[in-house]
Amino acid sequence: MEEPHSDLSIEPPLSQETFSDLWKLLPENNVLSDSLSPPMDHLLLSPEEVASWLGENPDGDGHVSAAPVSEAPTSAGPALVAPAPATSWPLSSSVPSHKPYRGSYGFEVHFLKSGTAKSVTCTYSPGLNKLFCQLAKTCPVQVWVESPPPPGTRVRALAIYKKSQHMTEVVRRCPHHERCSDSDGLAPPQHLIRVEGNLHAEYVDDRTTFRHSVVVPYEPPEVGSDCTTIHYNYMCNSSCMGGMNRRPILTIITLEDSSGKLLGRDSFEVRVCACPGRDRRTEEENFRKKGGLCPEPTPGNIKRALPTSTSSSPQPKKKPLDAEYFTLKIRGRKNFEILREINEALEFKDAQTEKEPGESRPHSSYPKSKKGQSTSCHKKLMFKREGLDSD
């Protein structure tokens, strides 16, 4: 028991003594003095040096302002709550004109003649001045000029809403189609109109009007051709929610010089749908019912109009028979017999024409074994009866 007491008298190890000495060196409240922490201000850059190093003025008023840490969450809070719809759906400050303008070069836009079959992917209605096409399908548009425009001329395609209450909104694709991986590497995902097979196409986002357009250089017609054809694609359906949302749109095609001066303008309505032929027939029929001018007929429309004309053809045959009698003097027995047979045949034909709808039903009700015999006897009896009546 005495050995432990003797151990207490032994001095602590060197490490413990060093720790205790260091602990005594600390000031009160465990705060280091200024002598132990030299100032670090000489290591910081001045505001002028920061501005010159960045090469630009972040605030735009000549000084660099420090963002307090306490204000960061307050400024970020409202940004998360407010969706800022103006940036996603901007309103244009101006509405471009869509009135046709041929200009001094006789600029016009034409389309190929097409029918209304179910298999068509693009069809144009001249009476409606409307193009019906499928999503992302080729739409050839012919550009006609009477005289060659100056070098550097460009052709621009721009889409706007047709109705006045929607004209200030920018036409763009719906969010679903914007996220689709169908980009060709040139067109931005929000652009509705694209140019197919032209590497010189330029897609423009106007910073003033926020509208989207696509510009291609004007190319003169090839040898043996009178026009230049541009192939456009429409990358969103007219019925897409969040996009056009069943609102009709117009496509404006303009001819511009190298400085952007307008040389010519033309426009047409566009409907992007799943069945262009069916929708064209429906709208043309509705247009006719409202008293509008009939559009130019197409082979498909002519074929569909034939059954209506054949169904109304039996109506002239239902005219009442002529009941007036005439007396004819004939010389010679042989001539009389010939004319009598002709007269009986004509009267039999008139009787069959008048009774044809009603007689077809009782004939079909006879048994198959006696059908041929009964009809032949019936005709002979009628023929004899008609002959007696004629005499």
From Swiss-Prot:
PANTHER family: CELLULAR TUMOR ANTIGEN P53
Entry comment on modification after translation: Phosphorylation on Ser residues mediates transcriptional activation. Phosphorylation at Ser-9 by HIPK4 increases repression activity on BIRC5 promoter. Phosphorylated on Thr-18 by VRK1, which may prevent the interaction with MDM2. Phosphorylated on Ser-20 by CHEK2 in response to DNA damage, which prevents ubiquitination by MDM2. Phosphorylated on Ser-20 by PLK3 in response to reactive oxygen species (ROS), promoting p53/TP53-mediated apoptosis. Phosphorylated on Ser-33 by CDK7 in a CAK complex in response to DNA damage. Phosphorylated by HIPK1.
Cofactor note: Binds 1 zinc ion per subunit.
Region named Interaction with USP7: 357-361
Species of provenance: Cavia porcellus
Region (Transcription activation (acidic)): 1-44
Gene responsible for this protein: TP53
Chain segments carrying region Interaction with E4F1: 254-292
GO cellular component, one term: nucleolus
Span list, region Required for interaction with ZNF385A: 98-298
UniProt-annotated stretches for the region Interaction with WWOX: 64-108
Record protein name field: Cellular tumor antigen p53
GO molecular-function terms, A-Z: ATP-dependent DNA/DNA annealing activity; copper ion binding; DNA binding; DNA-binding transcription factor activity, RNA polymerase II-specific; molecular condensate scaffold activity; promoter-specific chromatin binding; RNA polymerase II cis-regulatory region sequence-specific DNA binding
